[in-house]
Amino acid sequence: MAREYSLLNTRNIGIMAHIDAGKTTTTERILFHTGKIHKIGETHEGASQMDWMAQEQERGITITSAATTAFWKNTRFNIIDTPGHVDFTVEVERSLRVLDGAVAVLDGQSGVEPQTETVWRQATNYRVPRIVFVNKMDKTGADFIYSVKTIGDRLGAKAAPIQLPIGAEENFTGIIDLVEMKAYEFDGKPEENYKEIEIPSNLLEQAKELRAHLVEVAVEYDEELLMKFLDGGEISISELKSAIRKGVINADFFPVLAGSAFKNKGVKLLLDAVVDYLPSPIDIPSIKGILPTGEEVERHASDTEPFSALAFKVMTDPFVGKLTFFRVYSGILTKGSYILNSTKQQKERVGRILQMHANNRTEIEEVYSGDIAAAVGLKNTTTGDTLCDEKHEIILESMVFPEPVIQLALEPKTKADQEKMSIALSKLAEEDPTFRTYTDDETGQTIIAGMGELHLDIIVDRMKREFNVATNVGAPQVSYRETIKLPGKAEGKYIKQSGGRGSYGHVVIEFEPNKDKGFEWVDKITGGRVSKEYINSARVGLENALRNGVIAGYPMIDVKATIVDGSMHEVDSNEMAYKIAASMALKEAARKMNPVVLEPIMNVEVTVPDEYYGDVMGNISSKRGMIEGSEQRGNAQTIKSKVPLTEMFGYATELRSFTQGRGNYTMIFSHYAEAPKAIADEIIKKSGK
C-alpha cells in the first residue's frame, strides 16, 4: 500500500486549552469540516465525538487524549484532543511529546487562564510550534485585543494577530484577514460558509496598524526580508506568510486568530492556518536517540530510514484488548511484522495496526514515517517505550512523569469483587503512568495514588463501569515521602544457619543525600569481593527497603547509595541474603543520617473578585501558604502561592462559601519539602512506627 499523503502534507497537531475554553467543541467543528463526522455533537449535550468515555460525556470535560485522523485541502491531520483539567496534565504531557504543532484555544473573555499557562509551559519544554485561536468571540465580555495582550503578559510569548474580529459578543459577524487584507462575513450555519466583504471603514485604520506591526515582527525571522523591509521595500503576501511560518516553526512566534466554534465562525480559516503555518514532520528537527554503543544519532523523518517509533499511550479496549498508540519517527511498519522494544529489550509482534477516530477504528496494512496509529498485540510495551527495527536498535528519549501526590484506600465490596479489582487496577495503572496501586504491608489495604481528587474519582468510576467492580473508598490522604539530611555508613550482615545449607549476605554501604536526583546506586567494590550478581541483589533489596522509610514508613527519595565493601561465603551466599543485608545496612545507618518527613507542596492560584482579595490572602497564610504575588485580571485578582497539599483538602467548598461561589482555583504539584517538626511528629505518631 503506497503512502497517500506526502510528509510535507502531514500535520500532527494537538488542541490544548484551559478547561471550558471550548477546545472539544473546536475539535468537533474541525472533524465536521474535514468530513469525519456527519452530525456535530455538542459538549453540553454530552454528544461530543472526541469525548468518548462515559465519564467525559457526563462531566463535559476531556480526560484521555483521543487521537483521530482527518483531511483538509490535500493535507492529512493527525489530531490529538487533550484534557484541560490539571489532574490530567500527564495526558497533555505525553501528547505534546509526539506532536509537531498545536492549536492553543483561549476563551475570548478570559484570555490566558491558569491551566493555559501550565500547558503552555509544557509545550515550551518540548519546543512545540503553536498558533492561537481566541474562541467564544460571541460571548458577553469577549475582548480579542485583551486576550492577545494576556499572551504576552502572562506567558511572556511573542504573539500578534493575523486576524481582527468584526464586532464582538452578539455582534461578532466576521473577521479581517490581516495577511491578505481581506474581510469575510460568516453565515453562522454548520457548513460555515463565508463571503468576502469590504473592510468596515471603522476598522480600517486599526487593521492597517495591526498589519504593519505583524510585518515588523515577522520579517525578523527572515534575514533577506528584514533587509528588504529596512530598505523600504514592499513585503508580498507570500513572503509574509513564509516569514510567519518560519517564526512559528521556530516556536518563537505565535499568530493569533479569532472565532466562535459553537457559532460556526472561523474554524475553516483556522484549518487553513494549520496548513499554512504549522510544521510538517520534515520541518522540525530530527529525533535524537542512543545506539547500543552509547553513541547519539538522529533519525530523520523518512520512509527509507530504519523503523523507529515512540509508544505514547496504552489503552484497554473492550473489543480488541490492549491498544498501544505510537508515533512513527522514521521508516515503515507493516502489520504482522516483528519489532524490538529497545527500552525493555523484548521482541514484539504487531498483530494489527489501527487508525483511530475517537473510539472508532479502521484497520490498515502499514504506517509510515510521521504517522500516528495504534497497534494490537504488543504485550510488554508501556508508555514511553521505544519501538524499532530489530536490526537497527535505538532508544529514543522517553517521557518523565510526575509522582502521585494523593492516595486513598480501596476495599472491594464483595469477595467476588476482590479478584476483579486487582485485574482492573493493573490494567488502569498500565494505561496511566501517574496512577499507582500497591498493597499496604501493615494494614493489607489496597492503596491507589494519583494526581488529584478528580483523577482518583474517575479511576474508581471506571472500575465500576468498565470492569464492573464495586468498591468502598476511604478518605483521600497525602502521599508523604522521607529523605536523609546527613551522610552515613553502615554494614549489613545476614547469616542464618538452619541445619544443612545456610544463608550468608554481607555488604558495606555509604549513604548520602541526593537532593532532587532520586535514587542513585554506585558500585565501588574491587577485587571481586562480592560478585556482580549479588551486588545487583543488594541494589534490589535496598530499593525495596526504601519503599518503606525508617521513621514513618513512607517511600524514601533522593538517596545516593555506594556499595564499598562486603564478602561472600562459597556455599551459603544467595541472592535473598544480599537483599536482606542491604536493607539491614539502611536501617542501621538511618538514625545517624537525620531522616526527615517530606510533604508535597502545591502551586495554588486563586482567582477572586477584588472584594475578596484580603480574605483569600489571610486564608492562604493560615494554611502555611507562601504568597508569591498577585495580578489584576479584569475586575478580579489572581493570587499565586505555594501551599502544602495537606492543608488543601476541601478547599473548593471553603472557597465557594466565602466568595459566594465567585472564586475558583487551580492546584498543581510543585515539589516536596521538609515538613515542620510539629507536623512531622504528628505524621510519625499516626504511622505507628
Swiss-Prot record:
Cross-referenced InterPro entries: EF-G-like_DII, EFG_II, EFG_III, EFG_III/V, EFG_IV, EFG_V, EFG_V-like, G_TR_CS
SUPFAM superfamilies: EF-G C-terminal domain-like (SSF54980), P-loop containing nucleoside triphosphate hydrolases (SSF52540), Ribosomal protein S5 domain 2-like (SSF54211), Translation proteins (SSF50447)
Disulphide bond pairs: none
Protein name per its UniProtKB record: Elongation factor G
Any Pfam family: EFG_IV
GO MF term (any one): GTPase activity
PANTHER family associated with the record: RIBOSOME-RELEASING FACTOR 2, MITOCHONDRIAL (PTHR43261:SF1), TRANSLATION ELONGATION FACTOR G-RELATED (PTHR43261)
Record bears the keyword Transit peptide: no
UniProt KW Protein biosynthesis keyword: yes
Binding-site list for GTP: 17-24, 81-85, 135-138
Positions of the tr-type G domain: 8-282
Keyword annotations: Cytoplasm, Elongation factor, GTP-binding, Nucleotide-binding, Protein biosynthesis
One of the protein's GO biological processes: ribosome disassembly
Record's signal peptide: none
Superkingdom of origin: Bacteria
SMART domains found in the cross-reference section: EFG_C, EFG_IV
Role according to the record: Catalyzes the GTP-dependent ribosomal translocation step during translation elongation. During this step, the ribosome changes from the pre-translocational (PRE) to the post-translocational (POST) state as the newly formed A-site-bound peptidyl-tRNA and P-site-bound deacylated tRNA move to the P and E sites, respectively. Catalyzes the coordinated movement of the two tRNA molecules, the mRNA and conformational changes in the ribosome.
Cellular component annotations (GO), alphabetically ordered: cytoplasm
Subcellular location: Cytoplasm
Family classification: Belongs to the TRAFAC class translation factor GTPase superfamily. Classic translation factor GTPase family. EF-G/EF-2 subfamily.
NCBIfam families referenced in this protein's UniProt entry, alphabetically: EF-G (TIGR00484), PRK12740.1-5 (NF009381), small_GTP (TIGR00231)
